[in-house]
Amino acid sequence: MSQRNRTLQETTTIHTPAEVLRAAIDFFARQTGIYAAFPEQESTTHVTLRGQGGEEVVIAAIPGAGETRVTGSTYLFDQQVARFFATLAPVPLAVATEAGE
């Protein structure tokens, strides 16, 4: 995977933006040692988390038709962002297919 693909990741979920952002804050606070990150800035559509050595993690959640589009951006915490995304309930295939038509 190229560095660009690791620094900006995207997924969709059935959770609301508020649920996604709350889950991100909880997820990154539970990480151990150098992979913990804590809220620095928040809005209704994003949260910026700051970790060890000043590493920044930005999670954005934008509502859509029956889904929430979630993006994550970071330079060093790419594996943790991917793990967080794996905890989010995916959009059922039928909903995803109908939205694309």
What are these regions (language model features)?
Residues 7, 45, 55-57:
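Residue-level marker for the onset of beta-strands and adjacent loop->beta junctions
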Residues 34-48:
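Short Gly/Thr-rich strand-loop-strand
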Residues 49-101:
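Beta-strand/loop substructures that line and gate deep hydrophobic ligand-binding cavities in soluble
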Residues 1-37:
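Terminal, regulation- and interaction-focused segments at domain boundaries
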Residues 2-3, 39-41, 51, 62:
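A generic structural signal for short, solvent-exposed coil/turn residues
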Residues 27-30, 46-53:
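Short, solvent-exposed secondary-structure boundary motifs
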Residues 33, 39, 93-97:
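Short glycine-aromatic motifs
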Residues 7-9, 47, 70:
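Hydrophobic residues positioned within well-ordered beta-strands of beta-sheet architectures
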